[in-house]
Amino acid sequence: HSIMTDIFPREFTIENYQMVFEKSRVLKPMLNSLKMSLMAVIAGLIITVPVAYVVTKNNNIHNRLAKFIIMLPWSMPASAIAVNLINTFNQKSIFAFNKSLIGGFYILPIAYTIYALPLLFSSNEVAMKSINLGLEESSRSLGAGKLKTFYNVIIPNMMPGIISGAILVFIRTIGEYTMSALLYGVYNRP
């Protein structure tokens, strides 16, 4: 049996669902896509939460440039991102720790992360702008340092934006076909 060999399935049976979960040939690509999407969400959050905080707090030329760079992938099709990654990482370079990433496992999570940055940043920026500045000032006046205030006051108040952005990005990357088709290798079949 093969899953979805016809354009329209003839019938939805328990056998088809059973096959998805029993045969590793069918289940492994699904789990691989889940893992790569989750990696992209985590990497994107690590980048965008602090950047959203800094950009929202200070409106200077450097922060506007950072915002522009993070939002740039939104204006590019997925195929352009994939082709540029192929050109960048097809040979050994300092950016790839002196290895070629093409055909390896990490090229797809990197591509998904780049693809996800604008959506995550937008969600986190809106969440950051909705935080009452008095909360941060109160925390600082009570003796908490910048880092403690960030982790104990800012991040919990940003959590609805962080979660909604993470869910949207996860859904968007798990269904991304163009980059997957251009960048997959033996170790990362989506």
Predicted regions mapped to residue ranges:
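Short alpha-helical segment that forms part of, or immediately flanks, the ligand-binding pocket
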Residues: 136-137
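Short hydrophobic, aromatic-rich alpha-helical segments embedded in or entering the lipid bilayer
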Residues: 7-22, 186-190
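A short glycine-centered flexible hinge/capping loop motif at secondary-structure junctions
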Residues: 142-144
